[in-house]
Amino acid sequence: MSKPGRTILASKVAETFNTEIINNVEEYKKTHNGQGPLLVGFLANNDPAAKMYATWTQKTSESMGFRYDLRVIEDKDFLEEAIIQANGDDSVNGIMVYFPVFGNAQDQYLQQVVCKEKDVEGLNHVYYQNLYHNVRYLDKENRLKSILPCTPLAIVKILEFLKIYNNLLPEGNRLYGKKCIVINRSEIVGRPLAALLANDGATVYSVDVNNIQKFTRGESLKLNKHHVEDLGEYSEDLLKKCSLDSDVVITGVPSENYKFPTEYIKEGAVCINFACTKNFSDDVKEKASLYVPMTGKVTIAMLLRNMLRLVRNVELSKEK
């Protein structure tokens, strides 16, 4: 590239949603004695990243008119009971849990303990099923919008902000012709992100330590939802081939030692890092046209947006 690429801060993207969120909270307050919706966060670990996320969530939500209650659970064995109690508390509008807690399948179980009506993170199995099947509503009348997991949704919104989505195409096909690579296939972010992008029309290379897969909706988007094809076991050669074919490189490797090779980046590509550590080297902008080093502030904006959507869904359900 003739000149270095630009850095796009997450705060700049998040700002585009702030006015909408604040206005909706103010409307809510008019019918709820001047009080904003209540978000309850559960912290049952000593993870510094989780504590930082909790601090960011509280600061951002309260600045926008929400009420926020961080409940620290000293004995993690009592977390499930605390979540169930919040599920049944009509004063609570949204619930989130700062993971990891147990760091195993028990965490996946806890994700399902949060009732879907209050699941601001979009981790409930109903929401995941809708995501993977490209279903965008909870009801046949298309009134109750399904909830998407916060970080994958944040990355979609970043791509929209960067005009990677083509608004001239029909909704649901606006990534047609784009190729993306996602270096992470976790059940929380990587896999659902690959599915979301493919369901919107992209060809997505999904990378983990074992293999590389391709997510697409088939030739000319003939399929209603994404299809997964195994490309082979992980190798540097296959990674390089897929990456150099990609217009967008998205990384989420939770390791300070990991750096995505700059020489694998296609000239003019867009690079986005959603890990809490830097996954790209300092020379990334020698190849990338646009570089987003962190996504956290957009993730929190999507969490609050999800919460307002849940509040709206509850209100619409009562009208039936």
From Swiss-Prot:
Enzyme Commission number: 1.5.1.15
UniProt PTM: The N-terminus is blocked.
Localization (cell): Cytoplasm; Nucleus
Active site residues per record: C150
Keyword entries, A-Z: Cytoplasm, NAD, Nucleus, One-carbon metabolism, Oxidoreductase, Purine biosynthesis
One MF term in the entry's GO annotations: methylenetetrahydrofolate dehydrogenase (NAD+) activity
One Pfam family named in its UniProt record: THF_DHG_CYH
CDD domains given in the database record: NAD_bind_m-THF_DH
Signal sequence extent: none
Catalytic activity: (6R)-5,10-methylene-5,6,7,8-tetrahydrofolate + NAD(+) = (6R)-5,10-methenyltetrahydrofolate + NADH
Gene Ontology biological process terms in this record: folic acid-containing compound biosynthetic process; one-carbon metabolic process; purine nucleobase biosynthetic process; purine nucleotide biosynthetic process
Binding site for NAD(+): R185, S186, D208, V209, F274, A275, C276
Family: Belongs to the tetrahydrofolate dehydrogenase/cyclohydrolase family.
Free-text function comment from the UniProt entry: Catalyzes oxidation of cytoplasmic one-carbon units for purine biosynthesis.
The protein's name in its UniProt record: Methylenetetrahydrofolate dehydrogenase [NAD(+)]
